[in-house]
Structures are given as C-alpha cells and as structure tokens.
C-alpha cells in the first residue's frame, strides 16, 4: 500500500477455447507477474478459465467439471499470493448455470459474483445457456472490511454479491 492506495490490475491472458488447464496456466503466469508488481487486486475476464466462445460446450458436464477443477488448482497455487483475485468461469448452482466471477484470496475461494444481466441480442445469446442472478439467488456475505478513517476505529463491512 502506498499513500493509502492499493495497486489494481486487469489482466488479459491468452485463452484457448475449452482448454481449462492451458488457460489456468496462463492465468497463473499473469498472477505471478502481477505479484512482482505488488498488485493487491487482480481482475481477469469473464470465462477466462474456459474461453468465452464455448457455446453449447457450456452445457457439457466435462467442461464444467474441468473449469471447477482448474479453479481449485488456481486457488491452491495462489495460497501464498497476497491479493484478491477474480477469475471467470461457468458454475452450476441449484440446477441453473451461471456466468460467475470467483473471488480467491490466499488459496481460498471466498465467494462468487454471478452475472446479473444476460444479453440476448445480435451475436450475444447467452440466455440460451445461462441464468441471470436474481436477488433471491444472491447471498450476501461479509468478506472484507475497509477502514474509514485511521483516527477512528470505525469499520464498514462490504457486502459480497451483485
């Protein structure tokens, strides 16, 4: 932290469609590069683990399982990383498929942020595969506290969700 600010970075790793293992390695390479620059908040694109253009492959258990396994691998490989990391993947939950950003911190999955607006026009027909998160689908959990003022000992809890 410098002057009360943290370093934030958005990464765009090389992505191979439906090759979660290769994409995970590219994500880890980017994370390690950002670590060298002392980045504390790392954000990756939606579906960076699977690739955005998987279309009907998103409905295949094999791809969903591979994406989940790779998320666990990325979490394990970043247990020593002092940063909050967001990576995108498809996630099945309660019978629905969501486009989510998974939040990772020190090797733990601390939450998921589901996409709320699912486009369905022109080349975007995500509603064919994905559900949008409704308020009743989202559970808010306290996962981060930020100090308001160094002189006060007042802390605000930041809700996690959409």
Regions found by a protein language model. Name each.
Residues 1-162:
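Enzyme catalytic cores with a strong preference for nitrogen-chemistry domains
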């Amino acid at each position: 932290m410098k002057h009360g600010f943290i370093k934030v970075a958005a990464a765009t790793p090389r992505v191979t469609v439906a090759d979660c293992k290769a994409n995970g390695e590219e994500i880890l390479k980017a994370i390690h590069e950002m670590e060298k620059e002392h980045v504390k908040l790392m954000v990756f694109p939606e579906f960076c683990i699977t690739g955005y253009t998987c279309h009907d492959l998103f409905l295949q258990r094999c791809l969903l399982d591979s994406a989940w396994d790779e998320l666990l691998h990325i979490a394990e490989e970043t247990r020593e990383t002092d940063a909050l990391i967001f990576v995108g993947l498809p996630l099945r939950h309660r019978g629905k498929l969501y486009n989510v950003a998974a939040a990772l911190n020190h090797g733990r999955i601390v939450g998921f942020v589901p996409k709320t607006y699912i486009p369905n026009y022109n080349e975007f027909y995500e509603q064919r595969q994905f559900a949008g998160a409704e308020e009743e689908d989202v559970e808010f959990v306290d996962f981060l506290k930020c100090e308001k003022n160094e002189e006060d000992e007042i802390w605000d809890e930041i809700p996690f969700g959409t």
